[in-house]
Amino acid sequence: MLEIFSNFHDPKLFENSLTDVKEKPISVFYDWPCGWNQNEIENAISKNPHNILILGEPNEYFGTHDFAIQNSRLFSVILTWSDDIINRSDNAVLFPFGTTWLRDDYISKMENPTDKKFEVSFLRGAKKKAPGHDLRWDLYDDRNRVQVPTKFFDVLDDFDPNTGFHTDLYAKEIVWNESMFHIAIENHSHNGYFTEKVVDAFLTKTIPIYWGCKDIDKYFDEKGMIRFETKEEAISKINNLTEKDYHDRKEYMEKNYKLALHYANFFGRFKNFLNDLVTINKL
């Protein structure tokens, strides 16, 4: 019977999308293990003969990539965006993280936005644990140097300082509603690692001013975005923006929108992979 071990996503999110295989002898491990002892690991691995490991977060957080490389034999397949794991593990397969927390009806509404205006939006957030977090704070602290219209937030009204999390995922829609441009900064900068930070921009017909995935051009059309490496470069590029820069990128914006629909559907992509695995192996 299907087993789900997930450190971040609610296991029900997997269960709800995998009803077709709920009776199959498969265990799914998502960004696992974090803080598990050896006995707990062995017990979880032994529940089913087919074990699938999905890695979404960077190795810097919990060392899960190191664990995957050292223990790849425990898994039938490892799904990851990391070229390091793919190069060092025979059973690793490329599986970009992507994802989105935007509502389907909101994404549909934003397919043809009618109220976009010339401004740059940005949500700094409260975290300070990664290089991308530091860059967000540095840029926010220098926001007065930005000379074009902006809509900058440190945190949103739904942010709970006690837990460090936002309580209403839909509250972020205010970031995308009207802005032509959005500053999107990932937590870390790695090949293959991109998240809702940039996917949400593409889904809302917003041009991302982007720091993060080193090879993002493998997944999206780079002509539909603006990349930077440092705070100074970001401020310089932002201050040189015009409304024309948005309209000139519309062709590539449409292309990236369609690509983003694919990468946003994390659970759908995984469901398709799992169904193929079941069919090919006659599970």
Model segments located where?
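Pol beta-like nucleotidyltransferase catalytic core
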Residues: 1-55, 59, 63-148, 158-283
